[in-house]
């Protein structure tokens, strides 16, 4: 396995670790509605940081974006909006199925759809079937899916042992939302594929290869921001129990506390895709679809490890932890299989 591929896998791991940890600061926000908290963090992660970093990277910010036709920018934006819809559905999936089943189904579907649809759309799927390296990467995707399933099973055992239930369990509604979440969340993978002309243009301007994907986030995350912020603002305006004014009428120290934590959560959320871009840059072009598989499977891996570190599994008993550990090992094996496949 080449150093470039190894570093690509490593950066995807770092990005996934940030994704697994980003919600921790949000959990410490006090007396704010979820909508206010999510909006503050989202403005940082989806608008301020993408724009600021792109302004630093590009020699002429406005000239870069104005050089693209609407036919280039619109698919990137719409796939970003598609991802935004998946993001909203994620929370609803957890409500109706519970954390473990919801995450397992949603992540499993988005891993398959986001990974395999890209080469199908690009007409390259036959290369995966007819080459040794392609078959190895497909095997890695299958093994990763098995790993996600094992971790999901561990979560179910933990919830059963600790008496944790879904907020409003509804299997039919939950499954529909989980499938929608999985499909729509893959929009980020499709957006990165559609944004290749933007990456190439950034490279032509002399932007370092590690950073060429970052300017496209202005458009991708702009699409996601409209969906997420629109959802939050509509609820803040229409739901009687929610009030943006009330949330910002608290004691000044508490407002500062909440803003800083929300900003930190937004920063950590953005960093997952900052390092995703680094990892994506190191993956061979013919296997760039694997970036999504690495990100999603490592997200599950890191989520399990973070749960152990935070002692969330302390009262779950030995069996759930053993199953979780097995799932994590399987995901690590999957990453190595994919790495070997890409090297071939």
From Swiss-Prot:
Localization (cell): Cell inner membrane
Main localization of the protein described in the UniProt heading: membrane
Gene name for this UniProt entry: rhaT
Reactions that this protein is recorded to catalyse: L-rhamnopyranose(in) + H(+)(in) = L-rhamnopyranose(out) + H(+)(out)
Pfam families: RhaT
A single cellular component GO annotation: plasma membrane
Membrane topology: Multi-pass membrane protein
Protein name according to UniProt: L-rhamnose-proton symporter
Family label: Belongs to the L-rhamnose transporter (TC 2.A.7.6) family.
Transmembrane spans: 4-24, 38-58, 68-88, 101-121, 137-157, 175-195, 214-234, 259-279, 290-310, 323-343
Annotated organism of origin: Escherichia coli O1:K1 / APEC
One Gene Ontology term of the molecular function aspect: rhamnose transmembrane transporter activity
